[in-house]
């Protein structure tokens, strides 16, 4: 499998950060799938594909547009899909499926200045100005009392809003400290007084396979062929 994308090492980082955050054992279903698929390759239109993956989806996946790459012949298998069955989203009961972060105005201002290397003063407003497939943020705009900035693409947006100084509350009530990257770029922003509330879902970049989604599907009796078809539509499994 090909992960030679230095710019996007976040997808490896997401998984390792996630393991640290949750102190979780290796994903059994993914391990089992790897064993079962020994000697087989996943192809799309005759070419071996890069199987992007991340920790947890928000119920939807996104496409390469999240990284500023147009959809084309070679990446057409990375579509925005709904990770659900007739009973709803597979991951709906998992901690990272939904999360919230309350960031104080002064902390947000300092983080943005540090991360984007431009001081816009005290942040007055922060909004998602463009969204992409699956609802991922493609652009954010922050306006401060000394200027404004826009940040484009999933990874750069998560980096701009990352850093130490605030807590992220998962839907099960457990709390994680903020890290280098915002958990995902599937989020909305609300402002209340001096607090910016980021309401988000999922953990990781959201392109390709959700490891926890695959795990939940396997628990419900789905086999690896069905799981791969869900996350990489249009691909074929070949020896």
Where are each of the predicted segments found?
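Conserved, single-site charged/polar hotspot
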Residues: 1-239
């Amino acid at each position: 499998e090909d992960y030679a994308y230095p710019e996007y090492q976040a997808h490896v980082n997401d998984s390792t950060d996630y393991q640290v955050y949750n102190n979780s054992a290796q994903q059994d279903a993914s391990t089992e799938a790897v064993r079962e698929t020994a000697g087989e390759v996943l192809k799309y239109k005759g070419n071996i594909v890069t199987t992007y993956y991340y920790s947890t989806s928000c119920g939807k996946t996104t496409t390469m547009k999240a990284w500023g790459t147009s959809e084309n012949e070679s990446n057409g298998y990375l579509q925005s899909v709904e990770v659900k069955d007739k009973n709803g989203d597979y991951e709906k009961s998992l901690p990272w499926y939904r999360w919230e972060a309350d960031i104080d105005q002064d902390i947000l201002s300092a983080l943005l200045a540090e991360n984007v290397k431009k001081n816009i003063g005290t942040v007055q407003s922060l909004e998602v100005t463009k969204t992409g497939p699956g609802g991922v943020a493609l652009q954010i705009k922050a306006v401060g009392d000394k200027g404004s900035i826009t940040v484009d693409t999933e990874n750069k947006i998560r980096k701009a809003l990352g850093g130490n100084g605030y807590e992220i509350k998962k839907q099960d009530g457990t709390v994680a400290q903020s890290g280098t990257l915002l958990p995902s770029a599937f989020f909305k922003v609300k402002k209340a007084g001096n607090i910016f509330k980021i309401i988000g879902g999922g953990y990781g970049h959201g392109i390709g396979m959700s490891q926890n989604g695959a795990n939940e599907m396997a628990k419900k009796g789905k086999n690896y062929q069905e799981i791969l078809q869900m996350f990489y539509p249009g691909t074929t499994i070949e020896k």
